Amino acid sequence: MAIERTLSIIKPDAVAKNVIGKIYSRFESNGLKVIAARMTWLSEQEAGQFYSVHKERPFFKDLVSFMTSGPVMIQALEGENAIAKNRELMGATDPKKADAGTIRADFAESIDANAVHGSDAPETAAVEIAFFFPGMNTYAGR
């Protein structure tokens, strides 16, 4: 099993519901350690830059608007197979399709306000962690 790092964002809808601690508890009880964290209110520029991969998609403006609608909690997580484990804990993007007991099934309202973001691959995890935690060593296991 590989020790990995992944980026997680608790989105404005979940922050507003005051469930950060409940989500952190799920990370920790599933072997994911929070190794860096910060709460911030993203600017349009930051959100647009972070989600630039979606720039040409029809939902881009709504995504940026949503991600700047309130504070977010951003954390780097570390653990065995952290990327896949976090994605399993999050559940399907659409909370209506998410398995019971997942973060999105329990705390998300819609496919747009879906509570959390998580990196989808080692390459994106490294880029995403560096975006929010510049200078942080993103090589797992050091």
UniProtKB/Swiss-Prot annotation:
Keyword tRNA processing attributed: no
Cellular location(s): Cytoplasm
Residues that hold ATP according to the record: 11, 59, 87, 93, 104, 114
Names of the cofactor(s): Mg(2+)
Enzyme type, top EC level: transferase
Function: Major role in the synthesis of nucleoside triphosphates other than ATP. The ATP gamma phosphate is transferred to the NDP beta phosphate via a ping-pong mechanism, using a phosphorylated active-site intermediate.
Assembly notes: Homotetramer.
Protein name: Nucleoside diphosphate kinase
